[in-house]
Amino acid sequence: TCIDDWRSLGLGPSTPASSAVSASSHVAEEGVTEPINLRTWTLDDLDDTQTTTFVSASITSGVQNGKLTAKVFGYDIYKKEEIEKLAVGDKIAFHEEGAAQDQCVTTEVKSIERNDQHHFVSINGGMEQPGGLDLKLEDDDTYRTMTFDDYPLYYEMGEKTMPLAEDVVLKDSSADPQAEAVETTGADAVAAAINADPDNWTTYNTTLVVQGGKVLEVRRIWVP
């Protein structure tokens, strides 16, 4: 169950929520608008051999013995039609900044502002307010959370150690905003590149492409 209200966290989103349950055992609460990916994706899905998954990640300890350890992050996504019919008095579930995957909170919608020109929705005064949330139309049929500089509002899904594929490719365009991606191929060369700059692979600039539990690509972009 999502925590009934943001206030019940007491000490804020960094406090573990004792009443939270794992995503796999979660049951949707009637009358609450929930993220569509709340119950449908876990770290175990990265081991799926039939699916290629793109994840935002923070590489925490470089590459050791051909394996990298990364904190994997997600963000809340909602069906467009559910956000468009959301009204004052309804409830919405989301992850606050710094939350873990199982620390979903539910809050009552007390105010809602819509910017149709830019496809923004601000709930309860936006993310800077307690129980507030900002949403952006991501594509034709989903909204996602939004924070400063247009980033999603990330929550941590957990840490996972994964081997680099033998033919792994690093695409690194982090040098400057206009930089062309510099490609490095092969597990040893990619490991050396990551380990040469160990502290600069973060949620905001790093994407891992994973299939069957192996890292096929590492992508890093420039961020301010």
What are these regions (language model features)?
Residues 23-224:
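Solvent-exposed hydroxyl-ligand-binding patches built from regularly spaced Ser/Thr
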Residues 1-33:
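N-terminal Sec-dependent export signals
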